[in-house]
Amino acid sequence: MMRFTKFYAPSLKEAPKDASLPSHIFLTRAGFVEQIGSGLYNFLPLGKRVLDKIKNIVKEEMDKAGAQEVNLSFITPASLWQESGRYNVFGKELLRFKDRKENEFVLGPTHEEAMLSLVKNKITSYKQLPLHLYQIGLKFRDEARPRFGLLRCREFLMKDGYSFHANEEDLGREFELMYKTYSQILQRMGLDFRAVEADSGAIGGSGSKEFMVLAKNGEDDILICENCDYAANVEAAKRAKKTCQDERPEANYASKFHTPNIKTIDSLAQFFKINAFYTIKAVVKKAIYENESKLVVFFIRGSDDLQEVKAQNACSALELVDASEEELEKAGLVAGFIGFVGLKDIDFYIDFELENEKQMIMGANEKDYHLIGIDVVNLNKDRFKDLIEVKEGDCCVKCGAKLKQSKGIEVGHIFKLGQKYSKAMNANFLDENGKSQPFYMGCYGIGVSRLLAVATEASHDEKGCIWNKTLAPFVLEIIVSNLKDEKALEFANKLYEDLTNLGLEVLLDDRNERFGVKMNDFELMGFPYALVVGKGLEKNEIELIQREGLIKELIKTDELMEILKKKVL
């Protein structure tokens, strides 16, 4: 019997000092989780019950899709990461350590290498493909600034799956199947989500989609088309090419014009009395690579902003940081007057929307001078990249309708890895012609422990969590308002047994606490329904409270079971 007096759920009156998001505040105060270190959390019985429900939904849908569950070691030999080339690329988030024999290991944030090692030299023929293996296990990422509770912690529970294929077409089919599977998982959890185009990050590969749950406290900006199904993370969003009806500047090609102290796009547009659309902005960054760093210049339209993830991908850097004035001077770059005409010994890239643009204004690489009448033509195609940040109000690349910006929290990510890892680790099979080929791989991750926090972010009020019936640790709480009322206690015990026998998850609050304390805990913990057994029993009435909206309803005892079967079961 699940009695509150025997159930370990230590609630707190005050939120942790560093808690700013509702999920962090309520999950900690309600006794779902407990922080034991920076980015490290224990799951208490309430949290574990929700976590198990999330895991079961994920497992059921993955099994239904034909994937097979395995359980890999939390620790991976560093040699596998060195073999794939990710050992240095991943950065400081990858926790590296040595055992007493000086052997190097990592705590796995993902398991591409370990899973590939599992099938290498065992899956040897196309006849054994496709194969999809997954696990639900702990991961570790040494975040520089763990924050937001379970949303950005260092140790987390994740479902990561990896598929192996004989060709790209078969990988594409599995990618679409996982798209449907992840959508079904999130639909079953009752979450409002969007699958969006995304950047592949350190994992790499080609096709990539993120699953974002919409939430006002989301850490990611996403662009959603108001007309079609296009949606994308701002890091990967595309738009229909912009146009401008304002008059272009007119001048001979690359005429040099004296522009004293005109260092910003706004002052440049004002000086020439033109729209900033017809200017070219230079953004200088220091690109960090494995064994070196160097300055890179990105040229974009003056009316746009640089999207740094796109810029980082364009130059294949591990990281981009701002360049100092001293570094600009040393490279011979004049801040506020940089252009690509005559630019020497510096890598540069141009946003692809500028290709073939004419009569533009750009820096002359000389203090207090700009070039007007610039035509962006006859340049190496490799210099043109997608560099700009798409914003709300821009037009959809698919249908041309307006894009709307929303906040989202990433809960899942699916990738087409292609042959990146299999080539690096020499993992091959024999195709239909007996020829050795690298596997085509897919990678599919979903944040299991993160979903607990995301569900809270998506559904709460000022009093606490609001769980739906699918994820709630208990669907119904029976609250005895006065333990000295023996008739009420007897009725509550009998009701508990009857509802439990019907398969309902019920918690009986039999604590010797004031009624107000019990109600506060119900509102904080967020079970979907509560039944209050109290004075109304004298009139054969029980109060049913729906947590969402705190809607109260008096029900006659002889109608109670029928109403509960309709509303709660």
From Swiss-Prot:
Please state what class of enzyme this protein is: ligase
Q: Does the keyword Glycoprotein apply?
A: no
| Subcellular locations according to the entry | Cytoplasm
Q: Which CDD domains match?
A: ProRS-INS (cd04334), ProRS_anticodon_short (cd00861), ProRS_core_prok (cd00779)
Q: What is its EC number?
A: 6.1.1.15
According to its UniProt record, which reaction does this protein catalyse? tRNA(Pro) + L-proline + ATP = L-prolyl-tRNA(Pro) + AMP + diphosphate
Q: What is one GO cellular-component annotation here? A: cytosol
State the InterPro entries in the record. Answer: aa-tRNA-synt_IIb, aa-tRNA-synth_II, aa-tRNA-synth_II/BPL/LPL, Anticodon-bd, Anticodon-bd_dom_sf, Pro-tRNA-ligase_IIa, Pro-tRNA-synth_IIa_bac-type, Pro-tRNA-Synthase_IIa_type1
Which UniProt keyword terms apply here?
Aminoacyl-tRNA synthetase, ATP-binding, Cytoplasm, Ligase, Nucleotide-binding, Protein biosynthesis
Broad class of where this protein is predominantly found: cytoplasm
Subunit text: Homodimer.
HAMAP family, alphabetized:
Pro_tRNA_synth_type1
Q: What the record says about its domains? A: Consists of three domains: the N-terminal catalytic domain, the editing domain and the C-terminal anticodon-binding domain.
**Family membership noted in the UniProt record:** Belongs to the class-II aminoacyl-tRNA synthetase family. ProS type 1 subfamily.
Entry-linked NCBIfam families: PRK09194.1, proS_fam_II
Q: What does this protein do?
A: Catalyzes the attachment of proline to tRNA(Pro) in a two-step reaction: proline is first activated by ATP to form Pro-AMP and then transferred to the acceptor end of tRNA(Pro). As ProRS can inadvertently accommodate and process non-cognate amino acids such as alanine and cysteine, to avoid such errors it has two additional distinct editing activities against alanine. One activity is designated as 'pretransfer' editing and involves the tRNA(Pro)-independent hydrolysis of activated Ala-AMP.
Q: What is this protein called?
A: Proline--tRNA ligase
